[in-house]
UniProtKB/Swiss-Prot annotation:
Probably involved in connections of major cytoskeletal structures to the plasma membrane. In epithelial cells, required for the formation of microvilli and membrane ruffles on the apical pole. Along with PLEKHG6, required for normal macropinocytosis. This is Ezrin. The modification Phosphothreonine is found at residue 562. Keywords: Acetylation, Cell membrane, Cell projection, Cell shape, Coiled coil, Cytoplasm, Cytoskeleton, Membrane, Phosphoprotein, S-nitrosylation. It comes from Bos taurus (Bovine). The gene is EZR.
Amino acid sequence: MPKPINVRVTTMDAELEFAIQPNTTGKQLFDQVVKTIGLREVWYFGLQYVDNKGFPTWLKLDKKVSAQEVRKESPLQFKFRAKFYPEDVAEELIQDITQKLFFLQVKEGILSDEIYCPPETAVLLGSYAVQAKFGDYNKELHKAGYLGSERLIPQRVMDQHKLTRDQWEDRIQVWHAEHRGMLKDSAMLEYLKIAQDLEMYGINYFEIKNKKGTDLWLGVDALGLNIYEKDDKLTPKIGFPWSEIRNISFNDKKFVIKPIDKKAPDFVFYAPRLRINKRILQLCMGNHELYMRRRKPDTIEVQQMKAQAREEKHQKQLERQQLETEKKRRETVEREKEQMMREKEELMLRLQDYEEKTRKAEKELSDQIQRALKLEEERKRAQEEAGRLEADRLAALRAKEELERQAADQIKSQEQLATELAEYTAKIALLEEARRRKENEVEEWQLRAKEAQDDLVKTREELHLVMTAPPPPPVYEPVNYHVHEGPQEEGTELSAELSSEGILDDRNEEKRITEAEKNERVQRQLMTLTSELSQARDENKRTHNDIIHNENMRQGRDKYKTLRQIRQGNTKQRIDEFEAM
């Protein structure tokens, strides 16, 4: 039994490993990959590898994998990538997985500067990429620095502005918050709708020469062939829609395109290498086929896919609405719980205040009672002292009377009697003064006792009011709420007929306008970002593409206006113009 061959296929977000047989064809491997990732819109994609000479090459589906010039290593390395692009992502991409793969590939192209993107658009796209990864901005979850490990905008744009990494993140965070309510899948689609208006989006560029030997670029995309000057990949000069081309062929390095207009000459150019002509031919055939398919009724398979996608989208919207309803209910319960907790805390504080006032009133009452008792004791002592003094005074009066009688009855020495009389008179005066002081003290103590008694009565009334005040209302706890969450040596000449039956006049792509032009919100966001970034821009670091883009903007040109302009005139006139470049 032949030894199996190990193969590794890298998609934009995963690595897949398979073991294939030596006779496995490219289509069998491709089918195995798309089945594994659940992709049905297979016509946009292909398997890319690096050949023995170091050139990126698309795997031929009709040949054995082992018979193609895949670099010999174990495992064999392939990239699963978009080979062809839709004209309008919003109209054509059906499956979410298809949108995601395009989103990741286009984002990588913009961040690596393979697709030129002006600064203001880069920041807006960065915010959609953040919405696509993180969902709605939530300041509780998305703390400062949550974008620290994310590649958000091209390094070129960062180098051209005097802003720190944190300042870039702050700007993108502000715009991230603007996208609140947008589903992750919708954010990816919005990203692509803006990105598809970039001048270099979806274009394969090839170096060519015209008959004069002028170095030019050939751009192959979903709408046709465009010719660019060597120093300007943003602004095509001549365009040929697929509906004007009936045959493409090459002989060695010479490539010939035959227009449908029989009066027009062949469109001839030269590529530097034979393998480039092979790639051009493959891309022309594939893009022309898709161009035709888009202009015909959908096949049964595509109709079924679109119906299924609509049903899935409707189901997601229902689930989203249910989640939003559940989220709002949960937030309402949380708010009610927080409100009740606040009310509980307020009531507890009021209760503590009542208790503190009661304690203070009781202490004040106790202190006043003590003061009243003390005053009463002082009053009694003063009264007793006054009584003693009164008794002494009366005794002195009696003694005086006795002496006066003795003075009358006895004959004594006048001097002795006078001396004794003077002594008793002085003593009586002293006792009289002491009696008056004690009487004043008694009156003062009686007044203070009365004041203390009045304070005691007032305090008892206040305490009675506090103790009889209505208690604070009871605190209700919230109800518990649970939320569940080949080589070409076979020959050097190949030719392909491109049928354009029924679509000769169908060039509605020329009527398109940019997303910014038809979406006022995007237009407003881009204008705001342009104004913000202009203040931090270092004009000395503008690149050649920046200068070209700004000049196009100044002249009012965009991708679709340029497309209309470069297709003006008949086919012969445009071919003559190409030859004259």
